[in-house]
Amino acid sequence: MRMIDIIEKKRDGHTLTTEEINFFIDGYVKGDIPDYQASSLAMAIYFQDMNDDERAALTMAMVNSGDMIDLSDIKGVKVDKHSTGGVGDTTTLVLAPLVAAVDVPVAKMSGRGLGHTGGTIDKLEAIDGFHVEIDEATFVKLVNENKVAVVGQSGNLTPADKKLYALRDVTGTVNSIPLIASSIMSKKIAAGADAIVLDVKTGSGAFMKTLEDAEALAHAMVRIGNNVGRNTMAIISDMNQPLGRAIGNALELQEAIDTLKGQGPKDLTELVLTLGSQMVVLANKAETLEEARALLIEAINSGAALEKFKTFIKNQGGDETVIDHPERLPQAQYQIEYKAKKSGYVTELVSNDIGVASMMLGAGRLTKEDDIDLAVGIVLNKKIGDKVEEGESLLTIHSNRQDVDDVVKKLDSSITIADHVVSPTLIHKIITE
Protein backbone atom coordinates (compact mmCIF):
# COMPACT_ATOMS: atom_id res chain seq x y z
CA MET A 1 0.00 0.00 0.00
CA ARG A 2 1.29 3.49 -0.86
CA MET A 3 0.39 6.75 0.85
CA ILE A 4 0.27 8.62 -2.47
CA ASP A 5 -2.53 6.29 -3.68
CA ILE A 6 -4.55 6.98 -0.52
CA ILE A 7 -4.14 10.75 -0.96
CA GLU A 8 -5.22 10.62 -4.62
CA LYS A 9 -8.18 8.36 -3.83
CA LYS A 10 -9.54 10.82 -1.25
CA ARG A 11 -8.66 13.84 -3.41
CA ASP A 12 -10.90 12.38 -6.13
CA GLY A 13 -13.79 11.94 -3.69
CA HIS A 14 -13.67 8.18 -3.15
CA THR A 15 -14.24 6.28 0.10
CA LEU A 16 -11.18 5.04 2.01
CA THR A 17 -11.20 1.52 3.44
CA THR A 18 -10.51 0.78 7.12
CA GLU A 19 -7.18 -0.80 6.05
CA GLU A 20 -6.14 2.37 4.22
CA ILE A 21 -7.03 4.57 7.20
CA ASN A 22 -5.14 2.24 9.59
CA PHE A 23 -2.13 2.28 7.24
CA PHE A 24 -2.10 6.10 7.31
CA ILE A 25 -2.49 6.51 11.10
CA ASP A 26 -0.06 3.72 11.93
CA GLY A 27 2.59 5.02 9.51
CA TYR A 28 2.15 8.63 10.61
CA VAL A 29 2.59 7.84 14.32
CA LYS A 30 5.68 5.72 13.60
CA GLY A 31 7.21 8.51 11.51
CA ASP A 32 7.17 6.50 8.25
CA ILE A 33 4.71 8.94 6.65
CA PRO A 34 6.02 12.53 6.51
CA ASP A 35 4.07 15.63 7.58
CA TYR A 36 3.70 16.83 3.99
CA GLN A 37 1.78 13.69 2.98
CA ALA A 38 -0.32 13.74 6.16
CA SER A 39 -1.23 17.39 5.59
CA SER A 40 -2.09 16.62 1.98
CA LEU A 41 -4.53 13.90 3.09
CA ALA A 42 -5.98 16.19 5.79
CA MET A 43 -6.66 18.82 3.10
CA ALA A 44 -8.27 16.20 0.83
CA ILE A 45 -10.53 15.16 3.75
CA TYR A 46 -11.29 18.84 4.41
CA PHE A 47 -12.62 19.28 0.86
CA GLN A 48 -14.05 15.81 0.13
CA ASP A 49 -15.44 14.92 3.59
CA MET A 50 -15.78 11.35 4.93
CA ASN A 51 -18.79 9.08 5.29
CA ASP A 52 -19.90 7.58 8.63
CA ASP A 53 -17.85 4.39 8.18
CA GLU A 54 -14.66 6.32 7.38
CA ARG A 55 -15.19 8.60 10.38
CA ALA A 56 -15.65 5.60 12.70
CA ALA A 57 -12.55 3.90 11.25
CA LEU A 58 -10.45 7.06 11.67
CA THR A 59 -11.62 7.43 15.28
CA MET A 60 -10.76 3.84 16.20
CA ALA A 61 -7.39 4.03 14.39
CA MET A 62 -6.52 7.00 16.64
CA VAL A 63 -7.80 5.16 19.75
CA ASN A 64 -5.64 2.14 18.87
CA SER A 65 -2.55 4.30 18.27
CA GLY A 66 -1.91 4.48 22.03
CA ASP A 67 -3.03 3.24 25.44
CA MET A 68 -6.66 2.66 26.39
CA ILE A 69 -7.77 3.11 29.96
CA ASP A 70 -9.36 -0.05 31.30
CA LEU A 71 -12.34 0.75 33.52
CA SER A 72 -13.82 -2.75 33.36
CA ASP A 73 -13.33 -3.22 37.12
CA ILE A 74 -15.79 -0.39 37.74
CA LYS A 75 -19.32 -1.74 38.11
CA GLY A 76 -22.07 -0.33 35.88
CA VAL A 77 -22.19 1.69 32.66
CA LYS A 78 -19.49 4.38 32.71
CA VAL A 79 -20.89 7.52 31.10
CA ASP A 80 -18.57 10.38 30.19
CA LYS A 81 -19.55 13.94 29.32
CA HIS A 82 -17.66 16.16 26.92
CA SER A 83 -18.18 19.85 26.29
CA THR A 84 -16.74 21.52 23.19
CA GLY A 85 -15.74 24.35 25.52
CA GLY A 86 -17.03 27.71 26.53
CA VAL A 87 -16.71 30.49 29.06
CA GLY A 88 -17.80 29.92 32.67
CA ASP A 89 -18.62 26.29 31.88
CA THR A 90 -18.98 24.86 35.38
CA THR A 91 -21.12 21.87 34.35
CA THR A 92 -18.63 19.06 35.17
CA LEU A 93 -18.26 20.24 38.77
CA VAL A 94 -22.03 19.99 39.26
CA LEU A 95 -22.77 16.99 37.04
CA ALA A 96 -20.19 14.59 38.47
CA PRO A 97 -21.53 14.49 42.06
CA LEU A 98 -25.14 14.96 40.91
CA VAL A 99 -25.34 11.89 38.65
CA ALA A 100 -23.16 9.92 41.09
CA ALA A 101 -25.87 10.63 43.69
CA VAL A 102 -28.34 8.64 41.55
CA ASP A 103 -25.93 5.71 41.23
CA VAL A 104 -24.28 6.53 37.88
CA PRO A 105 -20.52 5.82 38.02
CA VAL A 106 -18.42 8.86 37.02
CA ALA A 107 -14.78 8.00 36.33
CA LYS A 108 -13.60 11.37 35.09
CA MET A 109 -10.31 12.15 33.48
CA SER A 110 -9.79 15.90 33.26
CA GLY A 111 -7.14 18.30 32.09
CA ARG A 112 -5.89 21.69 33.11
CA GLY A 113 -7.15 24.74 31.28
CA LEU A 114 -5.52 26.73 28.53
CA GLY A 115 -7.13 30.03 27.69
CA HIS A 116 -10.03 31.82 29.39
CA THR A 117 -10.18 29.93 32.70
CA GLY A 118 -8.79 26.80 34.25
CA GLY A 119 -9.92 23.30 33.46
CA THR A 120 -11.91 21.17 35.90
CA ILE A 121 -8.74 20.20 37.78
CA ASP A 122 -7.65 23.81 38.31
CA LYS A 123 -11.09 24.61 39.72
CA LEU A 124 -10.99 21.63 42.11
CA GLU A 125 -7.49 22.59 43.23
CA ALA A 126 -8.97 25.81 44.64
CA ILE A 127 -9.94 23.44 47.49
CA ASP A 128 -7.10 23.13 49.98
CA GLY A 129 -5.41 19.71 49.80
CA PHE A 130 -7.39 18.38 46.82
CA HIS A 131 -5.25 16.27 44.50
CA VAL A 132 -5.77 14.25 41.32
CA GLU A 133 -2.52 12.28 41.31
CA ILE A 134 -4.06 8.93 42.22
CA ASP A 135 -3.07 5.53 40.84
CA GLU A 136 -5.43 3.41 38.75
CA ALA A 137 -6.27 0.96 41.57
CA THR A 138 -7.26 3.81 43.92
CA PHE A 139 -9.24 5.49 41.14
CA VAL A 140 -11.26 2.31 40.47
CA LYS A 141 -11.79 1.74 44.22
CA LEU A 142 -13.07 5.31 44.76
CA VAL A 143 -15.53 5.08 41.87
CA ASN A 144 -16.84 1.69 43.04
CA GLU A 145 -17.28 2.95 46.60
CA ASN A 146 -18.49 6.51 46.05
CA LYS A 147 -19.45 6.51 42.33
CA VAL A 148 -17.22 9.49 41.52
CA ALA A 149 -13.51 10.31 41.21
CA VAL A 150 -11.43 12.65 39.06
CA VAL A 151 -7.92 11.86 37.89
CA GLY A 152 -5.42 13.93 35.89
CA GLN A 153 -4.72 12.97 32.28
CA SER A 154 -1.95 10.43 32.06
CA GLY A 155 -0.59 7.69 29.86
CA ASN A 156 -0.01 7.72 26.17
CA LEU A 157 -3.60 8.28 25.03
CA THR A 158 -4.32 8.90 21.32
CA PRO A 159 -0.80 9.97 20.22
CA ALA A 160 -2.08 10.00 16.62
CA ASP A 161 -4.62 12.66 17.55
CA LYS A 162 -1.99 14.85 19.26
CA LYS A 163 0.28 14.64 16.22
CA LEU A 164 -2.50 15.19 13.68
CA TYR A 165 -4.00 18.06 15.68
CA ALA A 166 -0.68 19.93 15.78
CA LEU A 167 -0.41 19.46 12.01
CA ARG A 168 -3.99 20.62 11.31
CA ASP A 169 -3.37 23.69 13.43
CA VAL A 170 -0.68 24.97 11.04
CA THR A 171 -2.09 23.71 7.72
CA GLY A 172 -5.56 25.29 7.65
CA THR A 173 -7.41 22.01 8.28
CA VAL A 174 -8.78 22.57 11.80
CA ASN A 175 -12.36 23.31 10.73
CA SER A 176 -13.23 19.95 9.23
CA ILE A 177 -16.20 18.07 10.73
CA PRO A 178 -14.76 14.52 10.27
CA LEU A 179 -11.39 15.60 11.69
CA ILE A 180 -12.88 17.45 14.68
CA ALA A 181 -15.40 14.68 15.43
CA SER A 182 -12.85 11.85 15.28
CA SER A 183 -10.40 13.87 17.42
CA ILE A 184 -12.91 14.43 20.23
CA MET A 185 -14.43 10.94 20.13
CA SER A 186 -11.05 9.15 20.05
CA LYS A 187 -10.07 10.83 23.34
CA LYS A 188 -13.36 9.90 25.05
CA ILE A 189 -13.22 6.27 23.88
CA ALA A 190 -9.55 5.89 24.86
CA ALA A 191 -10.46 7.21 28.32
CA GLY A 192 -12.66 4.13 28.82
CA ALA A 193 -16.19 5.47 28.43
CA ASP A 194 -19.02 2.98 27.72
CA ALA A 195 -21.43 5.77 26.79
CA ILE A 196 -20.89 9.44 25.97
CA VAL A 197 -22.95 12.61 26.39
CA LEU A 198 -21.81 15.60 24.32
CA ASP A 199 -22.48 19.27 24.96
CA VAL A 200 -21.84 20.98 21.63
CA LYS A 201 -21.71 24.76 22.05
CA THR A 202 -22.81 27.25 19.44
CA GLY A 203 -22.67 31.04 19.25
CA SER A 204 -20.10 33.82 19.62
CA GLY A 205 -18.21 32.15 22.49
CA ALA A 206 -18.09 28.74 20.84
CA PHE A 207 -15.86 26.95 18.36
CA MET A 208 -18.93 26.31 16.16
CA LYS A 209 -20.34 29.78 15.56
CA THR A 210 -23.49 28.73 13.67
CA LEU A 211 -26.26 26.34 14.66
CA GLU A 212 -25.87 24.56 11.32
CA ASP A 213 -22.18 23.75 11.98
CA ALA A 214 -22.89 22.73 15.58
CA GLU A 215 -25.61 20.34 14.37
CA ALA A 216 -23.32 18.79 11.77
CA LEU A 217 -20.64 18.19 14.42
CA ALA A 218 -23.13 16.79 16.94
CA HIS A 219 -24.60 14.35 14.39
CA ALA A 220 -21.09 13.29 13.31
CA MET A 221 -19.97 12.51 16.88
CA VAL A 222 -23.20 10.74 17.87
CA ARG A 223 -22.96 8.53 14.77
CA ILE A 224 -19.30 7.71 15.42
CA GLY A 225 -20.11 6.71 19.01
CA ASN A 226 -23.09 4.59 18.05
CA ASN A 227 -21.16 2.98 15.15
CA VAL A 228 -18.33 1.84 17.44
CA GLY A 229 -20.55 0.45 20.18
CA ARG A 230 -20.65 3.46 22.53
CA ASN A 231 -24.19 4.78 23.07
CA THR A 232 -23.94 8.51 22.45
CA MET A 233 -26.28 11.49 22.73
CA ALA A 234 -25.67 15.21 22.24
CA ILE A 235 -27.26 18.50 23.04
CA ILE A 236 -26.58 21.79 21.30
CA SER A 237 -26.39 24.59 23.84
CA ASP A 238 -25.88 28.31 23.49
CA MET A 239 -22.61 30.13 24.15
CA ASN A 240 -23.57 33.62 23.03
CA GLN A 241 -23.04 34.59 26.66
CA PRO A 242 -21.08 32.93 29.49
CA LEU A 243 -22.85 30.07 31.26
CA GLY A 244 -23.95 30.86 34.80
CA ARG A 245 -22.61 34.01 36.43
CA ALA A 246 -19.05 33.15 37.50
CA ILE A 247 -15.89 33.14 35.35
CA GLY A 248 -12.80 32.18 37.33
CA ASN A 249 -11.71 29.13 39.30
CA ALA A 250 -12.73 29.56 42.96
CA LEU A 251 -15.72 31.66 41.82
CA GLU A 252 -16.96 28.84 39.58
CA LEU A 253 -16.43 26.33 42.38
CA GLN A 254 -18.59 28.47 44.66
CA GLU A 255 -21.23 28.59 41.91
CA ALA A 256 -21.12 24.78 41.58
CA ILE A 257 -21.73 24.44 45.34
CA ASP A 258 -24.68 26.85 45.12
CA THR A 259 -26.12 24.87 42.19
CA LEU A 260 -25.84 21.56 44.09
CA LYS A 261 -27.76 23.28 46.91
CA GLY A 262 -30.51 24.20 44.43
CA GLN A 263 -29.54 27.90 44.53
CA GLY A 264 -27.54 28.13 41.30
CA PRO A 265 -28.14 30.28 38.21
CA LYS A 266 -31.14 29.19 36.12
CA ASP A 267 -29.19 28.51 32.92
CA LEU A 268 -26.47 26.42 34.59
CA THR A 269 -29.08 24.41 36.53
CA GLU A 270 -31.12 23.75 33.37
CA LEU A 271 -28.09 22.67 31.33
CA VAL A 272 -26.92 20.34 34.11
CA LEU A 273 -30.38 18.74 34.40
CA THR A 274 -30.59 18.25 30.61
CA LEU A 275 -27.11 16.68 30.30
CA GLY A 276 -27.52 14.73 33.55
CA SER A 277 -30.82 13.23 32.37
CA GLN A 278 -29.09 11.85 29.27
CA MET A 279 -26.29 10.39 31.41
CA VAL A 280 -28.80 8.69 33.73
CA VAL A 281 -30.73 7.17 30.79
CA LEU A 282 -27.53 5.94 29.07
CA ALA A 283 -26.42 4.37 32.37
CA ASN A 284 -29.74 2.45 32.46
CA LYS A 285 -30.80 4.08 35.73
CA ALA A 286 -34.01 5.48 34.22
CA GLU A 287 -36.21 4.60 31.24
CA THR A 288 -37.03 8.13 30.08
CA LEU A 289 -35.41 11.57 30.19
CA GLU A 290 -38.37 12.82 32.27
CA GLU A 291 -37.91 10.09 34.87
CA ALA A 292 -34.15 10.78 34.96
CA ARG A 293 -34.73 14.50 35.47
CA ALA A 294 -37.06 13.82 38.42
CA LEU A 295 -34.35 11.65 40.06
CA LEU A 296 -31.78 14.43 39.66
CA ILE A 297 -34.08 17.12 41.07
CA GLU A 298 -34.78 14.87 44.06
CA ALA A 299 -31.01 14.38 44.60
CA ILE A 300 -30.58 18.17 44.78
CA ASN A 301 -33.63 18.77 47.00
CA SER A 302 -32.75 15.98 49.44
CA GLY A 303 -29.15 17.17 49.83
CA ALA A 304 -27.81 13.85 48.46
CA ALA A 305 -25.92 15.56 45.60
CA LEU A 306 -24.18 18.00 47.97
CA GLU A 307 -23.30 15.16 50.35
CA LYS A 308 -21.81 13.25 47.40
CA PHE A 309 -19.65 16.28 46.52
CA LYS A 310 -18.37 16.44 50.13
CA THR A 311 -17.37 12.76 50.14
CA PHE A 312 -15.72 13.14 46.73
CA ILE A 313 -13.60 16.09 47.97
CA LYS A 314 -12.65 14.27 51.19
CA ASN A 315 -11.71 11.08 49.27
CA GLN A 316 -9.19 13.06 47.22
CA GLY A 317 -7.53 14.79 50.15
CA GLY A 318 -9.51 18.04 49.98
CA ASP A 319 -10.96 20.10 52.81
CA GLU A 320 -14.67 19.27 52.48
CA THR A 321 -15.63 21.98 55.02
CA VAL A 322 -15.43 24.54 52.17
CA ILE A 323 -18.89 23.32 51.13
CA ASP A 324 -20.40 24.80 54.30
CA HIS A 325 -17.77 27.55 54.65
CA PRO A 326 -17.14 28.91 51.15
CA GLU A 327 -15.24 31.84 52.68
CA ARG A 328 -12.37 29.32 53.08
CA LEU A 329 -11.95 29.26 49.29
CA PRO A 330 -9.30 31.62 47.84
CA GLN A 331 -10.62 35.21 47.96
CA ALA A 332 -9.44 38.11 45.79
CA GLN A 333 -8.18 41.23 47.54
CA TYR A 334 -10.38 43.68 45.63
CA GLN A 335 -13.99 43.59 44.43
CA ILE A 336 -14.57 46.30 41.85
CA GLU A 337 -18.07 47.02 40.50
CA TYR A 338 -18.41 47.61 36.76
CA LYS A 339 -21.42 49.89 36.35
CA ALA A 340 -23.86 50.42 33.49
CA LYS A 341 -23.25 53.61 31.53
CA LYS A 342 -26.93 53.87 30.56
CA SER A 343 -30.33 52.33 31.31
CA GLY A 344 -31.96 49.65 29.15
CA TYR A 345 -31.70 45.91 28.59
CA VAL A 346 -28.57 43.81 28.25
CA THR A 347 -28.55 42.55 24.64
CA GLU A 348 -24.98 41.31 24.30
CA LEU A 349 -22.31 39.80 26.57
CA VAL A 350 -19.48 38.67 24.29
CA SER A 351 -18.34 35.41 25.90
CA ASN A 352 -14.83 35.34 24.45
CA ASP A 353 -14.04 38.92 25.46
CA ILE A 354 -15.31 38.40 29.00
CA GLY A 355 -13.23 35.21 29.14
CA VAL A 356 -10.17 37.16 27.98
CA ALA A 357 -10.87 39.87 30.60
CA SER A 358 -10.91 37.16 33.27
CA MET A 359 -7.63 35.78 31.91
CA MET A 360 -6.07 39.26 32.08
CA LEU A 361 -6.81 39.21 35.82
CA GLY A 362 -4.85 35.93 36.05
CA ALA A 363 -7.69 33.36 35.96
CA GLY A 364 -6.39 31.53 32.86
CA ARG A 365 -3.17 30.46 31.17
CA LEU A 366 -1.61 31.69 27.94
CA THR A 367 0.97 28.87 27.99
CA LYS A 368 1.04 25.52 29.81
CA GLU A 369 3.75 26.82 32.15
CA ASP A 370 1.77 29.83 33.42
CA ASP A 371 0.58 29.94 37.01
CA ILE A 372 -3.10 30.55 37.62
CA ASP A 373 -4.54 32.86 40.27
CA LEU A 374 -7.39 30.75 41.65
CA ALA A 375 -9.12 33.65 43.44
CA VAL A 376 -9.65 36.13 40.60
CA GLY A 377 -12.31 36.43 37.94
CA ILE A 378 -15.62 38.06 37.06
CA VAL A 379 -19.14 37.59 38.40
CA LEU A 380 -21.99 38.72 36.15
CA ASN A 381 -24.75 40.54 38.02
CA LYS A 382 -26.83 40.90 34.84
CA LYS A 383 -27.34 38.51 31.91
CA ILE A 384 -28.80 38.95 28.41
CA GLY A 385 -32.46 40.00 28.68
CA ASP A 386 -32.06 41.63 32.12
CA LYS A 387 -33.17 45.23 32.72
CA VAL A 388 -30.46 47.55 34.02
CA GLU A 389 -30.46 51.13 35.34
CA GLU A 390 -27.65 53.61 34.69
CA GLY A 391 -25.07 53.30 37.49
CA GLU A 392 -26.24 49.81 38.47
CA SER A 393 -23.57 47.09 38.72
CA LEU A 394 -23.41 44.91 35.59
CA LEU A 395 -20.62 42.73 36.95
CA THR A 396 -18.09 42.48 39.77
CA ILE A 397 -14.37 42.22 39.04
CA HIS A 398 -12.53 40.06 41.61
CA SER A 399 -8.90 41.12 41.40
CA ASN A 400 -5.63 40.97 43.31
CA ARG A 401 -4.53 44.27 41.80
CA GLN A 402 -6.22 47.61 42.29
CA ASP A 403 -5.61 49.00 38.81
CA VAL A 404 -7.89 47.14 36.41
CA ASP A 405 -8.14 49.78 33.66
CA ASP A 406 -6.99 47.28 30.99
CA VAL A 407 -9.74 44.85 32.05
CA VAL A 408 -12.39 47.58 32.12
CA LYS A 409 -11.38 48.64 28.60
CA LYS A 410 -11.83 45.05 27.40
CA LEU A 411 -15.25 44.85 29.07
CA ASP A 412 -16.39 48.17 27.55
CA SER A 413 -16.41 46.60 24.09
CA SER A 414 -18.02 43.32 25.17
CA ILE A 415 -21.29 44.51 26.75
CA THR A 416 -24.18 46.09 24.84
CA ILE A 417 -27.20 47.77 26.42
CA ALA A 418 -30.14 48.65 24.17
CA ASP A 419 -33.78 49.70 24.57
CA HIS A 420 -35.24 46.37 23.39
CA VAL A 421 -35.40 42.99 25.12
CA VAL A 422 -33.56 39.95 23.74
CA SER A 423 -34.59 36.49 24.96
CA PRO A 424 -31.69 34.04 24.83
CA THR A 425 -32.19 30.36 23.94
CA LEU A 426 -30.19 27.98 26.13
CA ILE A 427 -30.78 24.57 24.56
CA HIS A 428 -31.26 24.52 20.79
CA LYS A 429 -31.55 20.80 20.08
CA ILE A 430 -31.17 17.28 21.42
CA ILE A 431 -29.44 14.89 19.00
CA THR A 432 -29.71 11.13 19.37
CA GLU A 433 -28.71 9.90 15.90
UniProtKB/Swiss-Prot annotation:
Cofactor detail note: Binds 1 K(+) ion per subunit.
Organism: Staphylococcus aureus (strain N315)
Gene Ontology MF: a single term: deoxyuridine phosphorylase activity
Residues annotated for substrate binding in this entry: R168, K187
Protein name, entry field: Pyrimidine-nucleoside phosphorylase
Family: Belongs to the thymidine/pyrimidine-nucleoside phosphorylase family.
Binding residue positions for K(+): G88, T90, L243, A246, E255
One GO-annotated biological process of the protein: pyrimidine nucleobase metabolic process
Protein origin, superkingdom: Bacteria
Pfam families for the chain: Glycos_trans_3N, Glycos_transf_3, PYNP_C
PROSITE patterns assigned: THYMID_PHOSPHORYLASE (PS00647)
Binding site for phosphate: K81, H82, S83, T92, K108, M109, S110, T120
Record keywords, A-Z: Glycosyltransferase, Metal-binding, Potassium, Transferase
Gene: pdp
Function, in words: Catalyzes phosphorolysis of the pyrimidine nucleosides uridine, thymidine and 2'-deoxyuridine with the formation of the corresponding pyrimidine base and ribose-1-phosphate.
Quaternary organization: Homodimer.
CC annotations in GO: cytosol
The EC number(s) this enzyme carries: 2.4.2.2
SUPFAM superfamilies: Nucleoside phosphorylase/phosphoribosyltransferase catalytic domain (SSF52418), Nucleoside phosphorylase/phosphoribosyltransferase N-terminal domain (SSF47648), Pyrimidine nucleoside phosphorylase C-terminal domain (SSF54680)
Primary enzyme class: transferase
Needed co-factor(s): K(+)
Catalytic activity entry: uridine + phosphate = alpha-D-ribose 1-phosphate + uracil; thymidine + phosphate = 2-deoxy-alpha-D-ribose 1-phosphate + thymine; 2'-deoxyuridine + phosphate = 2-deoxy-alpha-D-ribose 1-phosphate + uracil
